[in-house]
Amino acid sequence: MRLNTLSPAAGSNPSKKRVGRGIGSGLGKTGGRGHKGQKSRSGGKVRVGFEGGQMPLKQRLPKFGFTSRKSLVTAEVRLSELAKVEGNVIDLNSLKAANVITKNIVFAKVVLSGEIATAVTVKGLRVTKGAKAAIEAAGGKIEE
């Protein structure tokens, strides 16, 4: 194989469509755009979701719910992620230092997902019932 013998695989480099270049090309006259109408004109596009003046589906459906502002500063921490923290006292700052949660997080909750093998002390974090049982079974404890 040499640089001067390289060529693209068969069919991988099709020639571009040359539109409006005569009837024999197959894309002459209207150039594959059909007859008249907005989509046949240059710049004739409709925005996403536009239904020709009819009230769009997005606006016909009711609004519901909201985004809790508290959820933006709250994180769920899995039991398996507690192993990433060095030391056996786990609090908000140690989770941030270990890059388990981001710096803008104010509240964290430990949930039962994965396993924990080492005995750790969890300070100042919310803990689910299942996670609490798993931490205590591993010889750890929870402090408020």
Swiss-Prot record:
Region: Disordered, residue numbers: 1-52
Alphabetic keyword roster: Ribonucleoprotein, Ribosomal protein, RNA-binding, rRNA-binding
UniProt xrefs under Gene3D superfamilies: 3.100.10.10
A Pfam family the protein falls into: Ribosomal_L27A
GO MF term set: rRNA binding; structural constituent of ribosome
Keyword NAD: no
One GO location term (cellular component): cytosolic large ribosomal subunit
Biased composition regions of type Basic residues, renumbered to the chain: 32-44
Signal peptide: none
GO BP annotation list: translation
Regions of compositional bias (Polar residues) in chain numbering: 1-14
Coiled coil start-end: none
Protein origin, superkingdom: Bacteria
Compositional bias annotation for Gly residues: 21-31
Family membership: Belongs to the universal ribosomal protein uL15 family.
Subunit (UniProt): Part of the 50S ribosomal subunit.
HAMAP family documented for this protein: Ribosomal_uL15
Function: Binds to the 23S rRNA.
Protein name per Swiss-Prot or TrEMBL: Large ribosomal subunit protein uL15
Organism: Aliivibrio salmonicida (strain LFI1238) (Vibrio salmonicida (strain LFI1238))
Gene: rplO
